[in-house]
């Protein structure tokens, strides 16, 4: 069903009404100066940060490296690094903020993905209540099953979780690293290590 502006406005109104109730339960006055527009702002922010639940997944635009696929049988790796992402932890609805690195092995047909499309896939699966371990798996599956038909996909996530930063243990330094492997990356440790070396070398020359 096609989404309309009327649908969006109704969602904002319904969510804002419940945010007002939450503010009251917390002991706040949602009518005081400074909070009058907060429920609507929060509603719009939540809808934006969970937009992936209500929109279709982005399609990967395919480009060809050439007509002779034989040139790509040596497992050429494409690495898209430092894709900034933010999501909402599904346990506490607090932000997860970090970076995603995506590597894939070009198929023998020489098909590669449009650069921005990989970023859109990261944004799409980040825009929902999420856990980081699932996020990297979903990104890996989306690319592995796309029209570029890569021989393998490797997705690395590195992020700070506000649920442990501002509450609970309140650790300001801890980061979570999660990795998903598909195809050749799943069984070939040399290929895995090659990607880690690429990231490490980029860091050494101040490219990270």
UniProtKB/Swiss-Prot annotation:
Residues bound to Zn(2+): 89, 92, 163
Disulphide bridges: none
Keyword Protein transport belongs to the record: no
Short name of any one Pfam family annotated for the protein: GTP_cyclohydroI
EC numbers for this chain: 3.5.4.16
Catalytic activity reported: GTP + H2O = 7,8-dihydroneopterin 3'-triphosphate + formate + H(+)
A GO BP entry: tetrahydrofolate biosynthetic process
GO MF: GTP binding; GTP cyclohydrolase I activity; zinc ion binding
Metabolic or biological pathway: Cofactor biosynthesis; 7,8-dihydroneopterin triphosphate biosynthesis; 7,8-dihydroneopterin triphosphate from GTP: step 1/1
The UniProt record lists the keyword Hydrolase: yes
GO CC annotation, single: cytoplasm
Protein name listed in UniProt: GTP cyclohydrolase 1
Species this protein is from: Saccharolobus islandicus (strain Y.N.15.51 / Yellowstone #2) (Sulfolobus islandicus)
The organism's taxonomic lineage, starting at the top: Archaea, Thermoproteota, Thermoprotei, Sulfolobales, Sulfolobaceae
């Amino acid at each position: 069903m096609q989404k309309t502006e009327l649908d969006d406005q109704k969602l904002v109104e319904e969510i804002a009404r419940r945010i007002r109730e939450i503010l009251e339960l917390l002991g706040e006055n949602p009518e005081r100066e400074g909070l009058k527009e907060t429920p609507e702002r929060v509603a719009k922010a939540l809808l934006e940060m969970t937009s992936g639940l209500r929109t279709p997944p982005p399609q990967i635009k395919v480009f060809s490296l050439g007509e002779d696929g034989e040139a790509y049988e040596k497992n050429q790796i494409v690495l898209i690094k430092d894709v900034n992402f933010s999501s909402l932890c599904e346990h506490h609805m607090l932000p997860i903020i970090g970076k995603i690195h995506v590597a894939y092995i070009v198929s023998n047909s020489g098909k590669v993905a449009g650069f921005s499309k990989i970023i859109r896939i990261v944004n799409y699966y980040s825009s929902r209540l999420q856990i980081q371990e699932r996020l990297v798996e979903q990104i890996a599956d989306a690319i592995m099953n796309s029209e570029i038909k890569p021989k393998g996909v490797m997705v690395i996530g590195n992020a700070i979780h506000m649920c442990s930063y501002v509450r609970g243990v309140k650790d300001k330094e801890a980061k979570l690293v999660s990795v998903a492997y598909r195809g050749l990356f799943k069984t070939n440790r040399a290929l895995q290590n090659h990607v880690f070396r690429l990231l490490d070398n980029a860091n050494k020359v101040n490219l990270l």
